[in-house]
């Protein structure tokens, strides 16, 4: 597989949506009750959402699903799910799918895409903040309840809300130069690289929960003081660090929850 062999396109057919459901099961190993059903993909396509697929030949190897929302009279997109097959990861495919979402949103006059992500997932946080230019200033505790996915490790499904302001200086500078604008970090929140092993093993899961609870408190306190997540660092040992400070741009919709 090469990056050039994977083609991205909109999904509109029932066959495409069946492939999305199957890939979702493969990636997260959800129970049937927790899968986003085929009908939801159909609805998203019909009501102004996005179902973007990535295909290696005839085989779907990734997809992105979003649904439209409104806040204070502004239309935005909530990107609910992005999946990439294991053998196609770490090659930039997730970022390509997000950029396809951005292109489509801007063509329709939409300036904001949001999504949730697990703050314990180091690679995903780095993609969202450093490769896409999202920020975060909201934190939801146990948003989806305890799920059956092994990736969650039986922990509460705490989530940061990524705000991707598509026409912000931060995003446009990153896409034009490959670098985010300089930031002033006022505090940081750390995630140890061992978090994946700790979540996977019942005997060490309490360590992962301690990290989650400590970081939850730090995020909530920082956000209550007007700080935002504006950067992310990884060190040579793959430990992660959220960088928090005051975001100097004024993009916001009122009544954000």
What is the meaning of each model-derived region?
Residues 158-213:
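A conserved mid-domain beta-alpha-beta active-site/ligand-binding segment of alpha/beta enzyme cores
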Residues 116, 126, 133-150, 231-234:
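Conserved catalytic-core motifs of GNAT/GCN5-like acyltransferases
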Residues 142-175, 245-254:
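C-terminal "cap" of GNAT-fold acetyltransferases
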Residues 105-118:
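Conserved GNAT acetyl-CoA-binding A-motif
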Residues 69-79, 89, 111, 184-188:
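A conserved beta-turn-beta hairpin within the catalytic core of GNAT-like acetyltransferases
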Residues 1, 13-26, 171-187, 219, ...:
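A short, well-structured alpha-helix characteristic of acyl/acetyltransferase catalytic modules
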Residues 85-96, 108, 121:
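Conserved glycine-rich acetyl-CoA-binding loop
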Residues 6-84, 230-236, 246-249:
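A conserved beta-strand-loop-helix scaffold within acyl/acetyltransferase catalytic domains
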């Amino acid at each position: 597989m090469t990056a050039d062999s994977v083609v991205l396109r909109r999904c509109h057919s029932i066959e495409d949506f069946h492939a999305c459901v199957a890939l979702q099961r493969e990636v997260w190993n959800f129970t049937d009750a927790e899968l986003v059903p085929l009908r939801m993909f159909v609805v998203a396509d019909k009501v102004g959402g996005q179902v973007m697929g990535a295909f290696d030949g005839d085989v779907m190897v990734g997809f992105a699903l979003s649904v439209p929302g409104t806040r204070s009279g502004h239309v935005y997109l909530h990107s609910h799910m992005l999946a990439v097959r294991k053998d196609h990861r770490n090659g930039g495919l997730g970022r390509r799918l997000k950029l396809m979402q951005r292109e489509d949103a801007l063509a329709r006059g939409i300036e904001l895409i949001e999504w949730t992500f697990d703050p314990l997932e180091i690679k995903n946080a780095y993609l969202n903040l450093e490769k896409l230019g999202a920020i975060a200033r909201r934190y939801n505790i146990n948003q989806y309840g305890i799920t059956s996915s092994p990736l969650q490790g039986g922990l509460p499904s705490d989530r940061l809300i990524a705000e991707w302001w598509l026409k912000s200086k931060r995003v446009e500078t990153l896409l034009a130069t490959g670098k985010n604008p300089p930031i002033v970090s006022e505090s940081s929140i750390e995630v140890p690289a061992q978090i994946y092993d700790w979540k996977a093993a019942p005997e060490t899961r309490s360590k992962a929960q301690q990290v989650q609870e400590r970081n939850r408190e730090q995020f909530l306190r920082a956000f209550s003081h007007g700080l935002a997540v504006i950067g992310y660092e990884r060190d040579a040992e793959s430990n992660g660090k959220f960088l928090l400070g005051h975001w100097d741009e004024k993009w916001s919709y009122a009544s954000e929850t």
